[in-house]
Amino acid sequence: TYAPALDNGTINGASVIDDYPMLLNGEVWPRNANWRYQGLTALHTAIAQSLNTCAVRTNLAYGVSNSYDFLVDKLGFENLTYTDSQQVGNMALGGFEKGVTTEEMSAAYAAFVNEGVYTKPRTFIRVEDANGNVVLENEAQSTVAMKNTTAAIINHLLQEAALNGTGYEAQFSGMHIAGKTGSTNSNKDRYFVGYTPYYSCAVWAGYEHNQRIVASGNPCSAVFRKVMSAIHADLADKDFFSCSGLTSVAVCADSGMLASENCALDVRGSRVYTALVAADNAPTAVCTMHTAPTYTVNMADSDGNVTTVTGSVLNYQRELIEGHDEIVVEDAFMMLGGWNGFFGDEADDDFNMPDGDHDTTVAGPPDTTDQPSNVDDFIRAG
């Protein structure tokens, strides 16, 4: 989902995707593994935390059938069907009609290591007779699957997923690794596909009779770690490839745009981070999502001193699925019109603090004239 969308510019390395579900046949879909929704989410977080909603929204933005074509034509997946090409759940979440093989997955991920070049798997290179004469040659078949900048960004993102995300159990000392976990409903199938600068490896675990895998962690990550650590025992650590055409930019984690001063003043803490992006698809506009209301805070000391502090909130109002308001989205509390009643809906509203022990009054509302429009398939590419 993410690699082809990066490759054609649908998203960039700083994009923000809405971790919020949709309605499918009247039901809330998709669910995340942790049954939580964070709202506006930076791409690197969406991948590291395996957020299904973000994968679905990205796939819809890129095109379900386009995703199918990319996997079949560029990355050598041979078992995908026409039904897969028409279903976003299949293409975004891996719910394929016939499934894929670990060989296909390992070969596809190897393209990220090889600067975007896909090489068809082969079990032998050549056959020689007793005299060393070559009687059968099995030449490599390679094609350019994606830009080298796309592969480099994916490497960067999947390193974070393996280091701080769901793939942390696959780590072993002395080697750079990148990778991604996977699972099916009720953990009846588990996956880990990862790679180093030397090798790629895909691991699947499951029972013959489709039973739930009960484990404290992901058994595939543990297998990957044991196998790959042995293979790399005598290999020197090295980083993944670098290439021209990349740039690092300071961006807002809530808008995907270039960071402003207000992004660092978010009431949750600074929302500024550095993203790796392709130079020809980098964000150019400064964040319009953050606005900074000024609070006069009564310190309630004996001399009646008053201190003025500044914070910022998201200049955006979340649309909720009608009839499903019980779905709590974490970022809604940081937006204008947040559910906790902290912020007014209109520019002329008085701001009121939530009930409780406090000495704070709000001096004035933020400007809401530039509030972005709300769309169900919210993806910001900067």
What is the predicted function of each stretch?
Residues 18, 69-75, 136-144, 181-186, ...:
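A short, terminal or domain-edge coil/loop segment
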